[in-house]
């Protein structure tokens, strides 16, 4: 995860500079917002929510803001934390093409749907997360996160989503909404507490970060961080990294290798899909920029925050899959574009 902080900073700064909010731009409002009455309450089930997401993504692929499904008058959109109008930003202004990797999480209870996907942006592989909030059958919120520079070594795990993140859970085996939310929050509790026993982890839990498996790797080990380079087994440091890469989700966190994280606020456990047993979160990792490393002469840590989407496959109250991407770094003190006061 730490390498994700370093690798994403230039991409983030480029996005923040891509364009500020300017002009109204094309907006598919479909008339003035009517006065609300109880008769306007229409259910939007899972298929309805997925339809909104598919319609939105197709509009992006077509470069046609007018093809976006109906929008609320006060619709709000951000891209990598910057507030923009529909039709602005990298996803709208670049050539964007779909790939075979797509995870869709839909929550009819709170009217939210999220997609975690690999796209082609300008011919380059990119990792993208999008969240829509639907109210009265209109899109009220749009949140977009993306990063490019995906190395070819990450593509094998970004070709087909794991079944535990896309398959339906049999109705008789589904986990309650409350337990799904609790399990997702326990992951962040474990990270903040540097204690894997706090988390509701299954023994076979596997975490993927930016397309790399960083835990529970089979012998002789693999990556313990999302980096194209494998640890060098001929060095003591590489041997230790290989050892950590083979640990379970719980045991790895307990080594305190992630103690550079000061806090995770807000966590934003936003989309709970009981049908799939999957929870989508949009956490904000605040790094401790005052902590020094082992060398007393080393400079303080980098003052960066990390913004991402983390998706959890949860069955029987335990986390079996973690899919984390894209990693976008934000200068310390800036927030996620949705939560006032975040970033410190």
Regions found by a protein language model. Give the residues of each.
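Bacterial N-terminal signal peptides
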Residues: 7-17
């Amino acid at each position: 995860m730490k390498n994700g902080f370093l690798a994403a900073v230039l991409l983030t700064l480029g996005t923040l500079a891509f364009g500020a909010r300017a002009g109204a731009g094309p907006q598919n409002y479909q008339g003035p917002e009517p006065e609300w009455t109880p008769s306007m309450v229409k259910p939007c089930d899972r298929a309805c929510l997925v339809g909104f997401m598919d319609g939105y993504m197709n509009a992006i692929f077509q470069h046609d803001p007018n093809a976006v499904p109906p929008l609320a008058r006060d619709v709000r959109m951000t891209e990598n934390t910057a507030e923009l109008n529909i039709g602005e930003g990298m996803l709208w202004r670049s050539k964007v093409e779909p790939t075979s990797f797509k995870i869709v999480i839909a929550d009819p209870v709170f009217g939210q749907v999220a997609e975690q996907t690999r796209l082609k942006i300008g011919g380059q592989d990119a990792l993208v997360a999008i969240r829509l909030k639907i109210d009265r059958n209109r899109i009220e919120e749009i949140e977009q996160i993306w990063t490019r520079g995906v190395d070819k070594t990450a593509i094998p795990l970004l070709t087909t989503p794991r079944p535990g993140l896309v398959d339906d859970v049999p109705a008789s085996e589904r986990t309650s909404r409350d337990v799904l939310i609790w399990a997702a929050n326990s992951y962040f509790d474990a990270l903040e507490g540097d204690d894997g026993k706090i988390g509701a982890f299954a023994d076979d839990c596997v975490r993927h970060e930016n397309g790399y498996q960083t835990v529970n790797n089979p012998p002789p080990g693999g990556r313990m961080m999302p980096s194209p380079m494998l640890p060098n087994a001929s060095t003591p440091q590489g041997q230790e990294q290989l050892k950590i890469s083979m640990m379970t989700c719980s045991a790895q966190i307990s080594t305190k290798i992630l103690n550079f994280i000061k806090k995770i606020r807000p966590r934003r456990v936003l989309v709970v899909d009981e049908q799939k047993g999957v929870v989508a979160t949009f956490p904000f990792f605040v790094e401790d920029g005052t902590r020094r490393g082992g060398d007393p002469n080393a400079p303080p840590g980098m003052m960066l925050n990390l913004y991402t989407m983390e998706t959890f496959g949860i069955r029987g109250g335990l986390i079996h899959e973690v899919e984390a991407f894209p990693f976008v770094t934000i200068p310390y003190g800036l927030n996620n574009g949705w939560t006032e006061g975040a970033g410190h």
